[in-house]
């Protein structure tokens, strides 16, 4: 029985480790990120929590896949000024909306919510840039989604 418990704990730990983002953190790459293209803004999307590590849906901006909701990971998308919907879908689609201005940086936090069968990822636009930058600091840059 003890051996079975140890095996289960090790398997669970492996899933958590494999499912988490790895690579350079926002703090490490911030200075080397390309500048925001002229006339565009940048949307950063990040997930700080390990809770629900196995739940990693694709994240969309205006129905275009831009990344994946990996624990402790972030990605960004440069877009023209305008109104945008950021969404993630598991059993249900959760979304939040934002308006982007030229040169502006907006931050969207991906929160984990309980669900009937699986957890849900719910995007939440962060009210101010300082909070977003503070929360994203230890998240790792994710590769582009294929």
Q: What are these regions, as identified by a protein language model?
A:
Residues 1-20:
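Sec-dependent bacterial lipoprotein signal peptides
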Residues 20-146:
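Short loop/turn and low-complexity linker motifs enriched in small/turn-promoting residues
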